[in-house]
Design a protein with these regions (language model features):
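Short, well-ordered alpha-helix to beta-strand connector turns
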Residues: 12-13, 35-36, 68
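A short beta-strand/loop micro-motif in the catalytic core of glycosyltransferases
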Residues: 35-45, 71
């Protein structure tokens, strides 16, 4: 493991891990042990946990890595899914996270062209693994980009993660952070290359996320 991860952990600096499946399981496992936040592609949760249901796989990841405050799976044109943990010792009965996800999908406004977010309440959640967590599930939708404007998706994942980091540093609420990150990724798609289309902070398309309080 590289020294700067250990130094950040020693200095209690939060660590966001981009869980790339190309890393070896041992190397990535050590990083996830230190993670404060985890972001991954939609294929990673099943590959890591052997659980095909994404919400249940995200729950299993948070059970495996108790220091992580949330895990986000990016889902391309389907947006993203986030499982956020809070510390709570209440003994309430657990609710199946798959059922929670289905309920949230019904609340998504499919006619919205711009990114949106729907969230469950905080509750004790169970999945197809053995553990439970107290937290909430959020679904963020992607921007609906007209076909003539869709140029190149290279670097969209990195753009999304960069926006999540900005959201964390500015203490954005998750309900705003997810649409913001999806919007940044959507803007990037309109130019060739990983960096050319990245928006400036002054971009008018981001103003609704940046002018409001968290």
């Amino acid at each position: 493991m590289k020294w700067h991860y250990l130094l950040a952990d020693l200095m209690k600096i939060p660590i966001l891990v981009d869980a790339e499946p190309e890393r070896t399981k041992t190397e990535l496992g050590h990083l996830l042990d230190l993670s404060s936040y985890i972001v991954c592609s939609g294929k990673f949760p099943e590959k890591w946990t052997s659980i095909s249901c994404i919400p249940s796989a995200l729950l299993e990841i948070l059970v495996q890595y108790p220091r992580a405050r949330f895990v986000i799976a990016t889902l391309g044109e389907n947006g993203c899914m986030m499982l956020e943990r809070i510390e709570d010792d209440s003994g309430i009965d657990a609710v199946d996270i798959g059922n929670v996800a289905e309920s949230l999908r019904l609340k998504v406004h499919k006619d919205d062209n711009l990114p949106t977010c729907v969230s469950s309440k905080f509750m004790r959640l169970s999945g197809r693994g053995h553990g439970t967590i107290h937290g909430r599930l959020l679904i963020g939708t992607a921007e609906k980009i007209p076909a003539p404007e869709l140029v190149d998706t290279t670097g969209c994942g990195d753009a999304f993660i960069g926006a999540v980091l900005y959201g964390l540093c500015t203490e954005m609420a998750p309900e705003k952070m997810l649409p913001f990150a999806c919007q940044v990724a959507g803007i990037k798609c309109r130019a060739i290359g990983a960096r050319t289309g990245l928006p400036w902070r002054s971009d008018a398309r981001l103003s609704k996320y940046l002018r409001e309080a968290p």
